[in-house]
Amino acid sequence: MAKTIVGALAPLVAARARASDGVVIVEETVGRGVEVLAGVDVVKVNYTVALASSKARVDSAKFFVFGVGAGEVVEGFDAIVGGDGATPPMRVGGARKAVVPAALAYGDRGAGCDKTGNACSIPPGEDLEFTVELLEVK
């Protein structure tokens, strides 16, 4: 279950410890456009992902398109955009920052690992920081 926090990213880290079972969201900008319907809508977003432990950016995309709730992205990314009951879905024009726990990202397997599994761009057990801007609901 996501927890919404209004304010800067600094309180997000402290709040993250209290919300260890879920995504912690900072609402940077509340959109005024169409609200996302999880399981129905396809969205276009700009996003960046960084390792929570080092702040090293590991991924980013502009105009990324995916079906919300369709299993196309990690569960935490879906919760940021589509909401989860405790946090409302995003609206077009909105922007959020969030910390996604490893269990709702890549878990114990990590991602971008070499064939030996020793070098991973996202190490196993790593929490991730997302910045997401909702551009369009298709």
Where are these regions (language model features)?
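Cross-family detector of peptidyl-prolyl cis-trans isomerase
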Residues: 3-138
